[in-house]
Amino acid sequence: MQASAAFPKAARLLKTDEFSSVFRLRPWRRTAHFVIYGKPTGRDARLGLVIGKKYAARAVTRNLVKRLAREAFRTRRAEFAGWDILLRLHTRFDKKAMPSAASAPLAALCAGEIRELLDRAAREVARRNGAKPASE
């Protein structure tokens, strides 16, 4: 049971070449703050995160976004088998509405947008794989 709760290094995009190969493709979907890309690999699902200082100046905010994204992906990793998924922050958060990373609205906003993007990405993966159900 503990193995299914892990998020090992093998489930992450780590090298510049791995990120570049996914970035070369057109983005699948966008939300107000995030963009998601995907690339078929035929191997286990892997996640890459690009959360730059330009859009989230404080480290605590970047870490919150990464933590939420990793957890959302980890729980749905089987749906993305054979694909590299890259999630990129592309817009700043409104500092007046969300003054700190500890603010509940920021966590709720990020979690909601990430969940929405992963839902869309899962449908896209299923469509491109020939509409195979995730349970197979």
Swiss-Prot record:
Gene Ontology terms: cellular component: ribonuclease P complex
EC number of this enzyme: 3.1.26.5
GO biological process, one term: tRNA 5'-leader removal
Annotated InterPro entries: Ribosomal_Su5_D2-typ_SF, Ribsml_uS5_D2-typ_fold_subgr, RNase_P, RNase_P_CS
Catalysed transformations (reactions): Endonucleolytic cleavage of RNA, removing 5'-extranucleotides from tRNA precursor
Swiss-Prot/TrEMBL keywords: Endonuclease, Hydrolase, Nuclease, RNA-binding, tRNA processing
Coiled-coil intervals, chain numbering: none
GO molecular function: 3'-tRNA processing endoribonuclease activity; ribonuclease P activity; tRNA binding
HAMAP family registered for this protein in UniProt: RNase_P
Subunit description: Consists of a catalytic RNA component (M1 or rnpB) and a protein subunit.
Function (record text): RNaseP catalyzes the removal of the 5'-leader sequence from pre-tRNA to produce the mature 5'-terminus. It can also cleave other RNA substrates such as 4.5S RNA. The protein component plays an auxiliary but essential role in vivo by binding to the 5'-leader sequence and broadening the substrate specificity of the ribozyme.
Similarity annotation: Belongs to the RnpA family.
Name under which the protein is recorded: Ribonuclease P protein component
Protein's organism: Burkholderia mallei (strain ATCC 23344)
Taxonomic classification: Bacteria, Pseudomonadati, Pseudomonadota, Betaproteobacteria, Burkholderiales
Underlying gene: rnpA
